[in-house]
UniProtKB/Swiss-Prot annotation:
Residues 837-846 have a biased composition (Basic and acidic residues). The keyword Repeat does not apply. Belongs to the CSR2 family. Its main location: cytoplasm. Phosphorylated by CDC28. It is found in: Cytoplasm; Nucleus. Transcription factor involved in the regulation of fermentation and aerobic oxidation. Acts as a repressor of CYC1, which is involved in electron flow through the mitochondria under aerobic condition. Required for pseudohyphal formation upon nitrogen starvation. May be involved in viability at stationary phase and aging. The keyword Membrane does not apply. Residues 276-310, 847-860, 999-1009 have a biased composition (Polar residues). The gene is CSR2. Keywords: Cytoplasm, Isopeptide bond, Nucleus, Phosphoprotein, Repressor, Transcription, Transcription regulation, Ubl conjugation. It comes from Saccharomyces cerevisiae (strain ATCC 204508 / S288c). This is Transcription factor CSR2.
Length: 1121
């Protein structure tokens, strides 16, 4: 009699699975074909084709068996090994009617696990965390699935030895197999590489894997939350459903839906609750060979509605657990789920997940694993915390989440001797809820004396639990997803305060061998209990040595010391930690005293206390929904004397970023001069106590300490706020240092607007014109300092600079500098490096050899500006803006200062000096929010290469001799409105112009290039943008006399660029300027005579100055002749 083996056929998610029967007589043929075609199947089942297995029924029973054993596709991470499909498998139970994928269920109904080869090709992993997806696929009658069922394996492989060899083909290297399965499991769920936390050789190794190195929080104002919810279509639905009680009074407006569970007092939120039937204890037996629990009276997680005790959850409207007894068990596909998540949650509340990996080399007993995620604030008050002022440090908690991990709620278990995917256990009964980290209200914030109390709190919670877990050798993976509210503060670092996020883990490791020795009777009748031994991750791994030294701590130590050298409190601790010796097991030999409140333990228990920091980053607002990050443009006129234009690229500036800025000043009166242009960043930091009753400014420690050597330097300043100079252009190096200094050397009377002068009554009168500065401002980032560096830094508010030497210049060893300037950090003026600017077409650009951006100085007449550059590095950078935390406020302003001198119009002729100040608020964000991280690449970056030579244009490729000139070439790097000349001079023929205007002017200028002598030479090299820019001066002159009011002699005189080469340039104003055909630009040469007859005798074929092109365009025969 032939027995039948049920095979579940995958179908659509909205339909029931269809069950077919295959006779056991065909089993041998099926398995033989399965083994022969394994390689072909692994390469042919793509994700697109694999979806067909779950979409339609296969007509062949062979294909049914193939899909049931191998799965319905390949893993997205690997298509070569069969075990790579492990992390995408959908584990089923004994009930084949409820199966989603193809499986060979065991015929033993009493087993709580069975063998399966199911694979789910499309996990629908959107922005919803994967744990909720796994909850939807959870079998409600059991949560564990053991793949290595000996009964089922015997049924499959009893008639064919090929299957036995196929299942055990990884037996040669089980370690590589385990590592590969673990890495694929984590990679499939979006985790990055593992980071080790703790290592005790031959016993236990703990590591962590996170979904991201940093968590990015959106910048969303309270009034924009409703707007975003409105455009996402979830505002009306959110308003109709009130939100349950939360643990914060300052939380965001959290939208909900009719079936969404609300927050309880533990910040426990389940976005996808399942109304499932309570399963019977008979169907929830544990796998004894996978794990064991010493506490026999602990309830099974499956019997508690698939939730653990620490993560217990009560849904709104379902407070009585007996209400769901009569509801039918359902398991829907995520796409067919009736409860949809509002889009506002996905866009405004970022998700974050982390996985804890425990690797055991032997069977070990552990206590419950306590995990906490805390957000802590530390503020050091320089004069004591009011009102008592007994303590200097204020510490409190603004948010926390906690979990309890044990042997029942793991996600994945890989035994130590795992050789195939059939040996791996994945727990689906783990219904760990998704929690939301929010900011606590002022009344619910818990204060603590110092940062050591946080360690004591988690140890007290650990000691309160007496449960133990017997864990077999292997790898245990616990995954924990969380959601962060958008209004919580990001990680902040300031001179007197910190806002940090840390993940803490605590457990007790019990050594069985030591317990047996300790249980024997001792010779002494008096036994003294040993102190508790605690191990931190900093004992073995250098990355976790977090230095939370605050500059205020060092300041208070120096203030309280009376004539003695004050060492920071953390210095002795670090020295004491370095003197500890570690044995071969990585344990410290020093048994320090236990903290207060900790229970006394025997030496057979080792307490593990680990800490992992998290970095939260605030991103700029999205440009698609708000205009907060728009560019800045200022165009104003000061006192009808000076017009200035300022453009800045953006308002949200990443630290260590370079943002372009353009400043243009134009004089409106001739008695005005600009001496200096300075760009600075003003910073203001203020702190408030936890109850908002007391506050102080970051500059108060310096202002209230007359013994500080920088106190007088601070008092003489006009503005007390900190101002970090970023850029400066001046004619003399008389002011303080800046990060980038441009000193102009060829000005007239130290006026940045005048570079030429004219003679009037035997007196040089400067000729003022508009002046434009184009550069990139660099905003330096702060440096995290320890106790040693904090003592060497100047106090906040005093900025010192270190000069950056030019490697191309020889080092100057002159010691003629000022001693006082050396002591306060001023650079030596005698050792300044002068950058000589060559007189070429790029004379207005400075190539910085130190990697900084170029600076362009231009005038309206294109006069060559000679200047040199000095670079300095500040010892203290700028800090982040704080906009989402009222207790710590930090703001910045970009300030542009114009130093202006103006002569009175009266008879006194008194020169008065002014400072025109223009400031605008900016926001400094993290350096991780640079353009390469938050912006998409441009089309040019994706399609072109920087080193690739561009092909010629159509006109350049098809042009012949005597044809019209080619159009201006387009380069993305040289976009400017000045390059787009709309005149017809570029398309007029040379012959036609020479017939109208036989007299041409030969221009000889080094900056504008040589004149065109032959049209054949011009056609040999196509006209480029740089060539076209050099001829704009002549073309502008061609249309400057269209009305015929100016004299024709203007075109027979020298050009301004030629006269600018001389040492003395004068202008004669004795003639009448209103004479017909007279040009005001008649220059007088006092050094040598310039003969204009040479230009009249030379017949040039190039285009001359165009006065009027005529009423009609030229004909083709005129052009080609």
């Amino acid at each position: 009699m032939q027995s039948t083996v049920p095979i579940a056929i995958a179908s659509n998610g909205n339909k029931r699975d269809v069950v077919q029967n295959v006779s056991a007589g065909d089993e041998g043929d099926i398995l033989q074909r399965l083994a022969r075609n394994r390689e072909m199947i692994s390469t042919s089942l793509s994700p697109q084709k694999s979806s067909g297995f779950s979409g339609r029924r296969r007509s062949s029973s062979v294909r049914d068996a193939l899909s049931s054993f191998f799965g319905t596709g390949n893993s997205p991470t690997s298509s070569m090994d069969d075990y790579s499909n492990l992390m995408n498998r959908n584990y089923s139970t004994a009930s084949t009617a409820m199966c989603r994928g193809n499986s060979f269920p065991s015929d033993v109904g009493t087993k709580a696990y069975n063998i399966t080869g199911s694979y789910q090709p499309d996990r629908h992993r959107n922005s919803v965390p994967y744990t909720t997806i796994d909850q939807l696929h959870t079998r409600q009658d059991t949560g564990l699935r053991r793949e290595s069922d000996p009964v089922a394996a015997k049924q499959i492989s009893s008639n064919n030895d090929i299957v036995r060899s196929f299942i055990t083909h990884h037996a040669s290297n089980s370690t590589m197999f385990i590592n590969r399965v673990l890495s694929d499991y984590l990679a499939d769920r979006g985790f990055i590489k593992q980071t080790p936390l703790y290592n005790k050789k031959s016993v236990l190794e703990i590591s962590i894997a996170t979904s991201a190195e940093s968590v990015f929080l959106p910048t969303t104002k309270s009034d924009e939350t409703e707007y975003l919810s409105l455009i996402h279509g979830s505002l009306n639905q959110a308003r109709t459903q009130p939100v349950g009680s939360t643990n914060t009074a300052e939380s965001d407006f959290l939208p909900s839906c009719p079936t969404m569970d609300t927050l309880n007092e533990n910040n426990d939120l389940s976005l996808f609750p399942l109304h499932t039937q309570r399963t019977s204890p008979s169907n929830t037996a544990r796998t004894g060979n996978a794990m064991d629990t010493s506490n026999s009276d602990r309830a099974s997680p499956a019997s508690n509605n698939n939730t653990t005790d620490a993560d217990s959850f009560v849904a709104s409207g379902n407070n009585n657990p007996m209400n769901n007894n009569n509801s039918p068990a359902r398991n829907r596909h995520p796409n067919s789920h009736s409860r949809s998540l509002p889009n506002a949650w996905n866009s405004q509340m970022p998700s974050f997940s982390f996985a804890l990996i425990f690797s055991l080399n032997k069977s070990t007993t552990l206590s419950d694993i306590k995990v906490e995620l805390t957000s802590n604030v530390r503020v050091v008050w320089f004069n004591g915390l009011p009102p008592t002022k007994n303590v200097n440090e204020e510490c409190y908690n603004i948010g926390s989440l906690d979990w309890t991990l044990n042997a029942d709620n793991f996600n994945l278990f890989i035994p130590q001797g795992a050789k195939s995917p059939l040996d791996i256990v994945e727990n689906h009964s783990n219904n760990r809820k998704l929690k939301v980290l929010q900011k606590l209200s002022m009344r619910k914030r818990r204060s603590f004396s110092n940062k050591a109390v946080l360690r004591e709190n988690i140890l007290n919670n650990l000691n309160a639990s007496n449960s133990t877990n017997k864990l077999n050798a292997g790898v245990y993976v616990f995954t924990i997803p969380i959601v962060l509210a958008s209004r919580i503060p990001e990680s902040l670092y300031y001179p007197s305060a910190r806002v940090s996020y840390s993940l803490r883990l605590a457990t007790k490791l019990k050594d069985e061998h030591t317990q047996l020795v300790a249980s024997r009777p001792r010779s002494s009748s008096i036994s003294s209990p040993q102190k508790l031994r605690s191990y931190s991750c900093s004992d073995s791994y250098e990355y976790s040595q977090i230095d939370d030294t605050i500059e205020g701590e060092t300041y208070n130590n120096d203030k309280n010391s009376t004539g003695k050298i004050a060492f920071p409190s953390s210095w002795l601790k670090s020295a004491k930690g370095r003197l500890k010796r570690n044995n071969s097991n990585g344990r410290s030999d020093n048994n320090g005293a236990s903290s207060s409140g900790l229970a006394m333990q025997h030496d057979s228990e080792d307490t593990i206390n680990l800490q992992y920091p998290l970095n939260l980053v605030r991103t700029p607002p999205e440009i698609s929904v708000t205009t907060a990050n728009k560019p800045l443009y200022i165009n104003k006129v000061w006192e009808n004397c000076l017009s200035y234009e300022i453009s800045f690229a953006q308002k949200y500036v990443p630290l260590n970023g370079e943002i372009p800025i353009t400043i243009k000043v134009a004089p409106l009166v001739k008695s005005l001069s600009v001496k200096r242009i300075r760009v600075s960043c003003r910073e203001k930091i203020s702190y408030r106590s936890k109850d908002y009753q007391y506050d102080f400014d970051q500059l108060d420690p310096l202002a209230s300490d007359p013994c500080n050597p920088y106190h007088m330097r601070y008092l003489v300043r006009k503005k007390k706020d900190r101002s970090l100079p970023l850029f400066e252009v001046a004619s003399k190096c008389t002011s303080g240092p800046s990060i980038r200094e441009e000193v102009v050397t060829n000005t007239v009377d130290d006026n940045l607007l005048a570079y030429t002068s004219s003679k009037e009554n035997n007196k040089d009168i400067p000729f003022s014109e508009s002046f434009t500065v184009k550069t990139k401002l660099k905003f330096p980032k702060y440096c995290e300092v320890d106790a040693t560096k904090a003592a060497s830094l100047p106090p906040y508010g005093i900025d010192l600079f270190d000069p950056i030497k030019d490697p191309t210049q020889s080092e100057n060893t002159s010691n003629n500098g000022n001693v006082l300037g050396f002591l306060v950090g001023r650079p030596n003026r005698a050792s300044k490096t002068v950058h000589k600017i060559p007189q070429d077409k790029n004379h207005n650009e400075v190539n910085d050899t130190n990697g900084n951006s170029n600076t362009s100085l231009q005038t309206s007449s294109n006069v060559p500006i000679q200047h040199y550059t000095r670079l300095n590095k500040p010892r203290r950078g700028l800090y982040l803006d704080s906009m989402h935390f009222k207790n710590i406020q930090c703001s910045h302003k970009l300030e542009i200062v114009l130093r202006v001198s103006k002569t009175d119009s009266g008879s006194s002729k008194i020169i008065r000096h002014y400072e025109v100040i223009v400031d605008t608020p900016i926001y400094l964000i993290s350096d991780l929010c640079n353009t390469s991280n938050i912006d998409l690449p441009t089309y040019d970056m994706a399609t072109t290469e920087s080193s690739k030579v561009l092909p010629p244009t159509f006109e350049e490729a098809t042009s012949v001799s005597a044809s019209p000139r080619s159009s201006v070439s387009y380069y993305p790097d040289d976009i400017s409105m000045q390059q787009l000349n709309l005149s017809r001079s570029t398309s007029l023929a040379n012959g036609y112009l020479s017939t109208l205007h036989p007299k041409t002017t030969a221009v000889s200028d080094s900056s504008n290039g040589a004149p065109i002598r032959d049209q054949q030479e011009q056609q040999a090299r196509p006209l480029r943008t740089e060539d076209y820019a050099l001829q704009m001066g002549n073309e502008n002159n061609a249309y400057s006399n269209m009305d015929g009011l100016l004299s024709q002699d203007i075109f027979e005189q020298e050009t301004a660029a030629t006269l600018f080469k001389r040492d003395i340039v004068t202008m004669n104003f004795n003639n009448n300027i209103f004479t017909p055909r007279y040009s005001p630009r008649t220059f007088t040469n006092t050094d040598y005579n310039y003969n204009d007859n040479d230009n009249n005798d030379n017949d040039t074929e190039g285009p001359g100055p165009i006065i009027h092109p005529g009423p009609e365009p030229p004909r083709y025969d005129e052009i080609s002749s």
